[in-house]
Each structure stands twice: as C-alpha cells, then as structure tokens.
Design a protein with these regions (language model features):
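Conserved catalytic core of Hanks-type protein kinase domains
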Residues: 58, 165, 260
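Short strand-loop junctions, especially beta-strand C-caps/beta-turns
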Residues: 41-43, 178, 244-245
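Glycine-rich "substrate-gating" loop/helix at the edge of Rossmann-like oxidoreductase active sites
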Residues: 6-11, 182, 245-246
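Conserved core of the PLP fold type I
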Residues: 64-206, 212, 218-237
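Structural scaffold positions in well-ordered secondary structure
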Residues: 38, 173, 214, 256-257
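N-terminal small-domain helix-loop-helix segment of the aminotransferase-like
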Residues: 2-105, 112
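Active-site PLP attachment segment
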Residues: 219, 228-263
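Short catalytic/ligand-binding loop motif for oxyanion handling, primarily in non-cytosolic enzymes
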Residues: 44-48, 181-184, 219-221, 248-251
Length: 263
C-alpha cells in the first residue's frame, strides 16, 4: 500500500515546473531566445573561469578513486572550514568547521532543519508568496504548513495576520529573504520586530520557536541594499546555485544559541 498523503503529494503539479514546461514548448515554436522564462533558477551567464579551471585541475591531477568516492556525511572538513572562515570575515562571527553542515541542494538542508526542530503534529509558519516546495518538505515531516497572507504594498511581514497563526504547537517560522518570487528583502526593522515577537512568544509557550532562514539569493541585491544577518535561534541556509552559475550545494549553519556545534 502506498501512503495516501504521498499519493496526494505526487499527484499535485508544481506551478514552477508547469511554467518551465510551457516556456520550453513555446521556445521550440518561436526560439528560446525570444522567451522570458522566470520559472527555474537556471544559470543565464557563463560559469566563472576560476571554477571551471579548478574542476579541470581536480580531474587531471587527483586520484580518480578518491575524487569520485563518497565524501564524509557533512562533506570535506576543508570545505566546511573554508565556509566558516568566509562567514567569519563577512559577518564578524566565530564559526568553526563543526558549525557547518553541507548538503546537495537547499532542499535537503531545509528538510533536515524541519525534522530537527519539529515533531509530527506541530506546525511551521511561513509567508506568502513562498517557494511551493516548502509544502512537501514540511508536510513530509508530519508538520502542518501555515501561510501568512502577503502585505502586497511592500511584501514586508503583516504581523497582525502572522500573530494569529502562531500558537503553542508552532515549531518554527520559515523566512525567505530576498524572497522568491517577490524579490523583496526584509528590512532590519522587520527582522527586529520578528525577533522580538518570537522571543516573547517562545517565553509565553515555554519552548523555543526557531527561525529558519532560507537565503539562496542573499548576494543578489541592488542599489546598495543590504540583507541583514539573522542570529540567535536561527538555522540559516545558503545555496551557491542561487547566486552564481555553479552546481547546487547548500550550507546549513547551527544556531549560535544551541549548546553544542553538533546540534
């Protein structure tokens, strides 16, 4: 027997994939260069030459048995160390390699995070518009997804509507800034208000409500805009593919508030 909730999930269609299929079909008719495809985040510029050169060097000079073998579960210590050092330089943090969890794509990292901070029967609150795949990541873990309606004037958080969705069964709040698909980055004021609300609400219900911050587009901001750095009880995710034309990978960083880097 196949689980009904999985049959329901597999039977539903992704709007993003549908748009991609329509774009491909239309491109075959009039030429793909004449179609503006805003569905999948595929590269639209060449890969950096340094990245290509590094890959070619590895293929030419590294033992193929070692090169094509499995990496450690959390990936190579040298890669995690490099990510930690980059974050420390940019944001004044004190991360070590033990704070970094690498996955193939942000999907795996998000799924891990939901299972880490929540149990079946709890809920996760996010904000519309949102990446549709959040739904199977969360519901697949046995949690309910609650969606806060958008504040269409500026796509910052509608805190009145948001507060009505958070209760004693809320395990986490999931944000995506800069947002896919609106492009809006939450302001420092919005994030501070969110932090204050979650701190007060966690105290009210007697358990932590974690903030999961999905940030694949952190590097894609314009006109001097800044994306504030979120801290405290936060699991942050970075995807290389979201900001540069390279194969997808993701970084999961533990919350500074957790007692051990292994948590």
């Amino acid at each position: 027997m196949i689980a009904q909730h999985y049959k329901d999930m597999l039977g539903s269609k992704s709007v993003i994939r549908q748009i991609s299929e329509w774009s491909t079909a239309r491109g075959a008719e009039i030429g793909y260069e004449n179609v503006f495809d805003y569905s999948l985040g595929n590269p639209s510029v060449p890969c950096p030459t340094q990245f290509t050169a590094a890959c070619e060097d590895l293929l030419a000079h590294t033992d193929p048995v070692r090169l094509h073998g499995y990496t450690p579960t959390l990936t190579l210590p040298s890669a995690r160390k490099a990510v930690a050092e980059s974050l420390n330089r940019r944001f004044g943090m004190d991360y070590t390699a033990d704070h970094i969890f690498m996955t193939t794509g942000a999907a795996g990292a998000l799924a891990h995070a939901v299972r880490c901070v929540g149990v079946p029967g709890q809920n996760v609150v996010t904000f519309a518009p949102f990446f549709p795949e959040y739904k199977p990541y969360i519901e697949g873990a046995g949690l309910a997804l609650r969606v806060t309606p958008p504040r269409c004037a500026d796509f910052q958080i509608d805190f009145e509507a948001f507060a009505q969705l958070v209760d004693e069964n809320t395990a986490a709040v999931l944000i995506n800034s800069p947002n896919n698909p609106s492009g809006t980055a939450y302001s420092e004021e919005t994030l501070q208000q969110l932090a204050d609300f979650l701190t007060a609400t966690s105290a009210k219900y007697g358990h932590h409500i974690f903030l999961i911050s999905d940030e694949p587009y952190r590097e894609i901001v314009y006109d001097g805009a800044q994306v504030p750095f979120v801290l405290s009880r936060t699991a942050r995710f970075r995807s290389a593919a979201g900001s540069r034309p390279t194969p997808p990978n993701s970084t999961m960083i533990r919350s500074p508030a957790t007692p051990s880097p292994r948590v």
